[in-house]
Amino acid sequence: MSALPAIPASLPRRHSNLGQKLGLWLLKLLGGWSIQGELPAHNKIVIAVAPHTSNQDFFVGIAAALALDLKIRFLGKHSIFVWPVKRLLLSLGGIPVDRSHPQGVVGQVVAEFEQSDSLLLGLSPEGSRKKVQQWRSGFWFIAKQAQVPICLVGLDYNRNQLVFGPCMDAGENFADDLQQMRAFFQQMTAKYPENA
């Protein structure tokens, strides 16, 4: 595995040498993944990770976050945050969300951004491992309403690389922004390309 990219001081850290070693070991175990690109220097970010076609994507993402010693959060249905896995999910960065909540998921996550000094939220724009006709727009609305950038991270199974790409502010039109995002993600090879 190549050297890790430089980590800007503004990014929230876990401060865990053991976690970093575990993350590096997991990246090697999962097929010798490397981390490429330049990490963004923002303390609040929506990280859009794609293409998402396999359960392994989650484990590569968690391993990379641990290896980089970054405190990256992710969303999970509130009903999975129960004993015996609740403590593990929370310690890995899970944020329980209730889809039936009057604020909706977007409102709950925007409130989380507003209450946090720093928050890196990683999620999949596809919203599913299956092939989808269109990406969900929730991540875009979260970034727009919370006034935080969207940073693109690609999973390239052809080269076993997790690639930090460009960051952008949510513009006036989701469809226009999506075109820009897809131009980056089309350079990546999914684990199951037929589902990308």
Residue spans for each PLM region:
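Non-catalytic C-terminal accessory region of glycerolipid acyltransferases
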Residues: 2-18, 29, 102-196
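Acidic/glycine-enriched edge-of-secondary-structure segments
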Residues: 12-24, 89-101
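Helix-to-loop junction immediately C-terminal to a conserved catalytic motif
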Residues: 15-52
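Residue-level preference for nonpolar/small residues embedded in alpha-helices
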Residues: 18-20, 57, 81, 134-135
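A general structural signal for well-ordered alpha-helical segments in protein cores
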Residues: 23, 58-61, 106, 178
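A generic structural signal for alpha->beta connector loops
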Residues: 32, 69-71, 91-93, 118, ...
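Catalytic core of membrane glycerolipid acyltransferases/transacylases, capturing the structured
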Residues: 38-100, 157
